[in-house]
Amino acid sequence: NIPAIITNCSNNYGPRQHPEKLIPKLIYNILNNKTLPIYGKGLNSREWIYVDDHCEALIIVSKKGKIGNFYNIGSNINLNNLEITKHLLKFAKSKTKIGKNVKIKFVKDRPGHDLRYALNSNKIIKNLKWKPKVGILKGLEITFDWYLKNPNYYLKLKKKDITRRLGNKSK
């Protein structure tokens, strides 16, 4: 037997996230005056957790969690893709002149794309006394500010070919 604890988490976001993910992709497009592609009607909902909160939860689980148990790590904050996009556009308008004329383009949804991802995190909250500290608006603002201050991050990754995942064709 291997002593183990299993965790599941909701959608992470924050600085240095892989640029193909929704939030960094939207920020990159906003800061480069590119169209914002939104799947379907933008109503796909996700439970979002700021990366630092997820890391803190993992540390707490490693110290206080019980062997053989599983813990869901989430924020109970659900926003759809269109809501995330609108918040990021508000940050752009208040913090920079870039991205003020960016347009949203609704694109065909991926086949089998789930409408909602969410977790029940009551066990970790109740048993381990953990809860996330960073609210969604604060986390999005921190993330937006980081990408604003690090405009070459995506380009550096692209040079290392880290933006190409296995099975994807190079662009």
Give short role names for the model-derived ranges:
Residues 15-17, 21:
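Short beta-loop-alpha junction of Rossmann-like oxidoreductase domains
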Residues 5-6, 24-171:
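C-terminal substrate-binding subdomain of Rossmann-fold SDR/epimerase-dehydratase oxidoreductases
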Residues 1-15, 37:
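Conserved beta-loop-beta element that borders a ligand/cofactor-binding pocket
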